[in-house]
């Protein structure tokens, strides 16, 4: 298997935000990920591509320990989160603490059955923020970061379900941003949206990466090429090749990668 590791490129020019080493993951007795090695560059967008069932979402969900919600799942290896080099899949690390540092936005918008305001404030309240002025400030900041404030500032008390699909997804992004995470995980965040809403989300990611590291799963090769700085191609639970996005798409070193980005299978 030929690889083009991102580690050397990232270490020489950029800070590392997360380093995956020898990561394997098991659903019970079934091995879903096999010895994953991947570096996430700080304040950059990394895209995970590959055919359905290759392990992209499984890998993504390791970063915020979502697999811990189901008994029998287990991790081997490590994902070090910098700068403190905490192994966020280590059994000694509290998943709640991990999720405060690593937020996630899902494929379909999933706002809570609450007001626009309370959707964003909910996580802050869970973390112990009670002061109304502080809540107001943090909610507004998150909504502004998600490019949604001007559209909802006069209907913060309205149910989130009254927003359009694209607005709901940006609300979910604001909810993820409210806890001031270091990494945001996006699992095909625009697959259920129309082209205009998709464009807004993509533009938003370009702004967010100035202060946050982003890892995104996408089946859309054009989207990966547009928005990501680095790309990793996965197949059958392994990272086959990874590197700078333009190199991955224009000059892949692995035949499987070349066939996939050319659309010969998927």
From Swiss-Prot:
User: Which PROSITE patterns does its entry note?
Assistant: ABC_TRANSPORTER_1, ABC_TRANSPORTER_2, PSTB
Q: How does it sit in the membrane?
A: Peripheral membrane protein
Major location category of this protein: membrane
What SUPFAM superfamilies does the annotation carry? P-loop containing nucleoside triphosphate hydrolases
What EC designation does it have? Answer: 7.3.2.1
Q: Which UniProt keywords apply?
A: ATP-binding, Cell inner membrane, Cell membrane, Membrane, Nucleotide-binding, Phosphate transport, Translocase, Transport
**GO function terms (MF aspect):** ATP binding; ATP hydrolysis activity; ATPase-coupled phosphate ion transmembrane transporter activity
Positions of ATP binding = 50-57
Q: Where in the cell is it found?
A: Cell inner membrane
Q: Which reaction does it catalyse?
A: phosphate(out) + ATP + H2O = ADP + 2 phosphate(in) + H(+)
UniProt entry tagged with the keyword Amino-acid biosynthesis: no
Keyword Transferase part of the UniProt annotation: no
Q: What Gene Ontology terms describe where this protein resides (cellular component)? A: plasma membrane
> Where does the ABC transporter domain start and stop, copy by copy?
18-261
The UniProt entry's GO biological process terms, in alphabetical order, are:
phosphate ion transmembrane transport
Which InterPro entries does the UniProt entry name for this protein? AAA+_ATPase, ABC_transporter-like_ATP-bd, ABC_transporter-like_CS, P-loop_NTPase, PstB-like
What do we know about how this protein assembles, alone or with others? The complex is composed of two ATP-binding proteins (PstB), two transmembrane proteins (PstC and PstA) and a solute-binding protein (PstS).
Record's family? Belongs to the ABC transporter superfamily. Phosphate importer (TC 3.A.1.7) family.
Purpose of the protein: Part of the ABC transporter complex PstSACB involved in phosphate import. Responsible for energy coupling to the transport system.
Q: What is this protein called?
A: Phosphate import ATP-binding protein PstB 1
């Amino acid at each position: 298997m030929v690889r083009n590791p991102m580690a050397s490129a990232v270490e020489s020019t950029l800070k590392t935000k997360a380093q995956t080493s020898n990561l394997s993951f098991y659903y019970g007795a079934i091995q879903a990920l096999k010895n994953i090695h991947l570096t996430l560059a700080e304040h950059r967008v990394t895209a995970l591509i590959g055919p359905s069932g290759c392990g992209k979402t499984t890998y993504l969900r390791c970063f915020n320990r979502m697999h811990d919600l189901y008994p029998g799942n287990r991790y081997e290896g490590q994902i070090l989160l910098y700068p403190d080099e905490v192994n966020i899949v280590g059994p000694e690390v509290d998943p709640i603490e991990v999720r405060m540092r690593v937020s996630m936005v899902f494929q379909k918008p999933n706002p809570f059955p609450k007001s626009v305001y309370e959707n964003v404030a909910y996580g802050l309240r869970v973390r112990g923020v009670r002061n109304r002025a502080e809540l107001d400030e943090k909610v507004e900041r998150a909504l502004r970061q998600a490019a949604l404030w001007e559209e909802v500032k006069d209907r913060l008390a309205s149910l989130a379900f009254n927003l359009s699909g694209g607005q709901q997804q940006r609300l979910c992004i604001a909810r993820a941003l409210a806890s001031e995470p270091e990494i945001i995980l996006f699992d095909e965040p625009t697959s259920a949206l129309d082209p205009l809403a998709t464009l807004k989300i993509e533009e938003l990611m370009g702004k967010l990466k100035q202060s946050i590291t982003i890892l995104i799963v996408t089946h859309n090769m054009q989207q990966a090429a547009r928005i990501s700085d680095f790309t990793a191609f996965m197949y059958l639970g392994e990272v086959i090749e990874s590197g700078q996005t333009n190199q991955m798409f224009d000059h892949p070193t692995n035949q499987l990668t070349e066939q996939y980005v050319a659309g010969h299978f998927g």
